[in-house]
Amino acid sequence: MAMAKAGAPRVSAAQLVTLGLSLLCAVAGPAAAQNCGCQPNVCCSKFGYCGTTDEYCGDGCQSGPCRSGGGGSSGGGGANVASVVTGSFFNGIKSQAGSGCEGKNFYTRSAFLSAVKAYPGFAHGGSQVQGKREIAAFFAHATHETGHFCYISEINKSNAYCDPTKRQWPCAAGQKYYGRGPLQISWNYNYGPAGRAIGFDGLGDPGRVARDAVVAFKAALWFWMNSVHGVVPQGFGATTRAINGALECGGNNPAQMNARVGYYRQYCRQLGVDPGPNLTC
């Protein structure tokens, strides 16, 4: 259930030109940090950099105080998240979990909607159909990772998921960075920047993700917006590759991969949209 490290995003020539202009504007104050992990009051640009000018907070802004194009419930195209993720939809997922599951009283629609306000780019930036597909994809992966919101933390807690080579995000003594939350965020190099972006000590207190449902959803959405959101238009298979490609794609574990596809198809049907092409990886 551990989340795989996402690869570096590919940047086109046109993006490099725009990125260069954005970096020139850094003199005005923004501190560039690839793949974001920005402070709460700083925007994450469509190319994954932190800043506060229009180049960062304008068109394509992924998270933070976006000024245009992001739009949590309006603007920038896409789907109205609160209208799509109804109580019936959310609780319908939870109802599939057993009565003794710890997550049944932890994961709530209100916690998700509270968290998604911090990520106005989620389910936005394209058409309403594309927005609904992104919502279906997010919940398909969350369903697979948590067993219909049954599990809060990874079952096997023996692995510390500490990568000492990631010196920017040093592991704290006695802490383990195993999977927690809707997407089972794992590894010190994910907890560290997620905590910095959300506003908690991800390295010193990774357990916060398992104690606070809003933080849990924010951590999942942080990973999603930084590592998955950009590949959603490529098809559901690309989102699986971004989350757990090393373990499930390329024939490594077709049963697990196809289980994700099954949930995605189911949720697309519920939301009234075609799942689109390229569902497998």
Curated annotation (Swiss-Prot):
GO terms for biological process: cell wall macromolecule catabolic process; chitin catabolic process; defense response; polysaccharide catabolic process. SUPFAM superfamilies: Lysozyme-like (SSF53955), Plant lectins/antimicrobial peptides (SSF57016). GO terms for molecular function: chitin binding; chitinase activity; endochitinase activity. Residues 34-68 form the Chitin-binding type-1 domain. Keywords: Carbohydrate metabolism, Chitin degradation, Chitin-binding, Disulfide bond, Glycoprotein, Glycosidase, Hydrolase, Plant defense, Polysaccharide degradation, Secreted, Signal. Gene3D superfamilies: 1.10.530.10, Endochitinase, domain 2 (3.30.20.10), Endochitinase-like (3.30.60.10). CDD domains: chitinase_GH19, ChtBD1. It is found in: Secreted. It is an enzyme of class 3 (hydrolase). This is Endochitinase B. Maize chitinase B seems to be less active than chitinase A. Residues 1-33 form the signal peptide.
